Design a protein with these regions (language model features):
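Non-catalytic signal-transmission and effector/linker regions of two-component phosphorelay proteins
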Residues: 1-23, 27-30, 127-153
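Two-component/phosphorelay signaling modules centered on CheY-like receiver
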Residues: 23-41, 116
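Residue-level signal for the "D+5" position in two-component response regulator receiver
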Residues: 42, 69-70
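Acidic, metal-coordinating helix/loop segments flanking the phosphotransfer/catalytic sites
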Residues: 44-60
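Active-site residues of response regulator receiver
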Residues: 63-66
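Short amphipathic alpha-helix used as the core "switch/output" element in two-component signaling
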Residues: 73-91
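Alpha4 helix (beta4-alpha4-beta5 surface) of REC/receiver domains from two-component response regulators
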Residues: 74, 101-123
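A short, hydrophobic beta-strand element within the central beta-sheet of small alpha/beta folds
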Residues: 86-107
Length: 153
């Protein structure tokens, strides 16, 4: 006789990497997205972001475009190489913090960032829209995860 036991995972459901040189900005972003279901790693430069990306998987990346040591573009490029090397089917949503006008006014930069997997842009002074964008991206990711799975009986 087998037990019909449902194992409910404990601990955080979503892992975030927040890479920004400002302690204050990282704190604001953490405050906007932190729940019991999130685990958040904060770093202050691009090299530290790459170290964390090599250590483990993240569900959402929040990157400052002009990070010190390695900028956000370099971080995204190297992250893409890591994903390709691992042949990972999971590509976490990425949000870039920058001056919105800087990106919106530069079609080439916008296209390049999107080709690297950037899903959204937020002004470098994060606002409540950050939480809404993160929620939308997580819902889209969850939908991608469930596509192709057999329906529960």
């Amino acid at each position: 006789m087998t037990d019909n036991v449902v194992h409910i995972p404990t601990g955080p459901r979503w892992r975030f990497l927040i890479a920004h040189q400002s302690d204050a900005v990282r704190h604001v972003i953490r405050t906007l997205v932190e729940t019991e279901q999130t685990s958040i790693v904060e770093v202050a430069d691009g090299e530290a972001a790459l170290v964390e990306l090599e250590r483990g998987r993240f569900d959402v990346l929040v990157l400052q475009l002009d990070l010190p040591l390695k900028d956000g573009i370099s971080v995204m490029q190297l992250h893409r190489l890591l994903l390709a090397h691992e042949r990972s089917p999971v590509d976490p949503p990425a949000i870039v913090l920058t001056l919105a006008a800087e990106v919106r006014g530069n079609v080439t930069l916008t296209d390049h960032l999107q080709s690297l997997g950037v899903d959204g842009f937020i002004d470098d002074a994060p606002m409540p829209q950050t939480a809404a964008l993160v929620e939308t991206l997580l819902q889209a990711r969850e939908a991608r995860r469930t596509i192709g799975k057999p329906a529960a009986a």
